[in-house]
Amino acid sequence: MFASRAIRMMSMRPMARTMATKAAAPVKVPVQLFGLDGTYATALYTAAAKESDLSKTEGSLAKLRDVFAQQPEVAQIVSNPTLSHEDKQTVVNVLSQAVGGDKTLTNFLTVISDNNRLALIPGIIEKFETLVNASKGLVEATVTSASELDKKTVNRIQAAIAGSSFVGEGELKLNLKVNPDILGGLIVEVAERTVDVSVASKIARLNHVLSEPI
């Protein structure tokens, strides 16, 4: 329900004014995303595609990602639930200037600011990249391990994922992450699907079973 309302708002609010003079064909979204950040990323992708602005918006989001990476305090600011309307508008203006004043992105930031969703920006950036990659025939997969994997293991994992129905006719883009907290095993994420065979996950399931009343 909220997802549908969010997309309607994207089309009815500031973006609608910028697109009112164009009768663009319906945009085909390359992959379905879930979660609130996925909903907003899809709305931004659709708006940018209608404006023939995908490459520009992609570049602007890359700059925005750099802002968050280089200035960790920005994430803390946008996550502050006590920001006033004026504060949020200031944040939107500063972020807009940082990425070069991209009109589509500025309107989008205004919408999510009005909806108190500025904290979702990092997730939206990631999901937007997933959409762009999918439109190019790229299928992203992230493999998380407790320690760095050797080349032979990486090649085996890559071959297994590339040959799966998740990738199909697309081209696999493999991202590797290391997280010692999973203790061992792997967590494989392909698009919106997650396969968790980590030791930490198994321990959590065991603890759950042991805590259940007999």
UniProtKB/Swiss-Prot annotation:
Pfam families: OSCP. GO terms for molecular function: proton-transporting ATP synthase activity, rotational mechanism. Transmembrane segments: none annotated. It comes from the Eukaryota. One of its GO terms (cellular component) is proton-transporting ATP synthase complex. Residues 1-24 form a transit peptide. InterPro entries: ATP_synth_OSCP/delta_N_sf, ATPase_OSCP/dsu. Keywords: ATP synthesis, CF(0), Hydrogen ion transport, Ion transport, Membrane, Mitochondrion, Mitochondrion inner membrane, Transit peptide, Transport. GO terms for biological process: proton motive force-driven mitochondrial ATP synthesis. It is found in: Mitochondrion inner membrane. Belongs to the ATPase delta chain family. F-type ATP synthases have 2 components, the catalytic core F(1) and the membrane-embedded component F(0), linked together by a central stalk and a peripheral stalk. The central stalk, also called rotor shaft, is often seen as part of F(1). The peripheral stalk is seen as part of F(0). F(0) contains the membrane channel next to the rotor. F-type ATP synthases form dimers but each monomer functions independently in ATP generation. This is ATP synthase subunit 5, mitochondrial.
